[in-house]
Each structure stands twice: as C-alpha cells, then as structure tokens.
Design a protein with these regions (language model features):
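Alpha-helical "hinge/linker" immediately C-terminal to small N-terminal DNA-binding modules
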Residues: 1-13
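Central regulatory/effector-binding core of bacterial HTH transcription factors
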Residues: 17-80
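Short, well-ordered beta-strand segments
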Residues: 21-23, 68, 116, 165, ...
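Short loop or secondary-structure boundary microenvironments that flank
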Residues: 26, 144, 199-202
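Hydrophobic packing within well-folded, soluble alpha/beta domains
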Residues: 40, 49-51, 157, 181, ...
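C-terminal regulatory
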Residues: 59-64, 74-192, 221-227
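A late-sequence structural motif
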Residues: 184-226
C-alpha cells in the first residue's frame, strides 16, 4: 500500500489529505452524491476527489482505489462491505412501444413482448427481467431487438421503442412526468437493488478514507434513496 511510512498513531491521527479515489456508478453519483460533495470538501479542503465510473470488478489494493460504491447483489468478496440502502426499481416502456405491442397487465402477457437486453462486463448475456409474484421472484428472459451495456443507452433504447426495461425510479422521474416512458406491471414489483460501500481493510483505513466512509454513511441515513 502507498501509505506514508509512519507510526500507526501518527497515521491514524494525521489530517485527512491527498487524493481520494472512489469507484461509483455515474448516474447514481450524479443524482445522490455530486449535489452534496461541496459539503464534504468544505469540511476537508485538503482532500482531492477522483471519481471513476465503472461496473467492472476492481482490485482495490492493486489499483489504489480507496472506496467502491456498488449497486446490486455482490459476489463473494474479501472487502469490508457496508450497506447504504436499497433502491426501488420499476418496469418501463415507451407509449409508442405499448401502442404497438399492447400494455401488459399480467405476467402471462409478457409472451408477446420484447425487453431491451442489458449485459455487464461480468455477464455477457442479457439479464432477465425480474418480478415479485406472490412473494416469489420470477425471471423472464424475453427476446431482444437490441442489447446494450450502458445505463444511458439502456434508457435511450426504451425511449426509442425497443422494449421493456427495469431501472431505478430515481433516474426517470422526468421521463415519467413528460410521458416519454410509462410504468407497467405495477402489481408485480421489481426486486430492490442493494447499495453497498466497499473498502479493503478496517485496520489500514487512511484518514481521508475514514472521513469519507463516515460522511457517505451519514449521507444515506439522512437522504432517501428513492427520491
């Protein structure tokens, strides 16, 4: 680790300073974190933030990443994990798409529908749609007209009538208000997504990491994740 070679006491009591590297989903950061960052930097002006947007696996020690904020279920990890909250998801489609293929009211109606295929760097085939029906999660791997691996193109594909998508509600209030997207299958909720903070070790947390971890945990205690 590239920490300054000093006694443990001096290290733990050093003033928070230097570059703090955070790996986080870009839309999530823009919506929830970016508007509040001035507060953090005003309190700790000697910290410089470096935000990296990615959904790939990160070797935090090898790559010098201080903290990772992940959305979704986590694979087994040796990292320290702190749960920040859960994000509500919704199923959406464009009005023109629904006009052409019909509005699904029951899960059985999905047999005549398409989904926008979304795949991540860790999964090279589209992720099925998920619905909760009678307290049980049901998966629907619908046919696709288009497959994407970015959040912005995923939403754009739905707005251009390529199929159903499942996304966090917080990033789509405007499209819903403007009628560019419509919520469907409201009787069958989508499982929520956990939001987690990950870092390498409790014993080797730098002062700048410590204050950011405390700040981000408090931020999400005070701020609902679904607004």
């Amino acid at each position: 680790l590239s920490y300054i070679n000093e006694s443990d006491h001096d290290f733990l009591n050093a003033k928070p300073q230097g570059t703090l590297k955070i790996e986080v989903h870009g839309i999530f950061a823009a919506h929830f974190i970016m508007p509040k960052l001035h507060q953090f930097l005003s309190e700790f002006p000697q910290i410089q933030l470096q935000l990296t947007e990615s959904d790939r696996y990160v070797d935090v020690i090898k790559e010098g990443i201080d903290c990772v904020i992940r959305i979704g279920q986590l694979n087994d990890s040796d990292l320290i994990v702190r749960h920040l909250g859960d994000i509500q998801q919704v199923t959406l489609a464009s009005p023109d798409y629904l006009k052409k293929y019909g509005v699904p009211n029951k899960l059985k109606d999905l047999n005549r529908h398409f989904m926008v295929g979304f795949y991540s760097t860790a999964r090279q085939k589209p992720i099925p749609l998920e619905f909760i029906d009678k307290q049980k999660t049901e998966l629907y791997d619908l046919p696709t007209m288009i497959q994407v691996n970015g959040a912005n193109t995923y939403s754009a594909a739905a707005k251009h009538h390529f199929g159903l998508i499942q996304v966090p509600r917080y990033g789509h209030h405007l499209e819903l208000e403007q009628g560019k997207l419509c919520e469907v299958l409201t009787d069958y909720p989508v499982p929520s997504l956990p939001v987690s903070l990950l870092y390498a070790s409790k014993t080797l947390v730098s002062p700048r990491q410590k204050v950011f971890i405390e700040w981000i945990i408090q931020l999400f205690k005070e701020q609902p994740l679904n607004e």
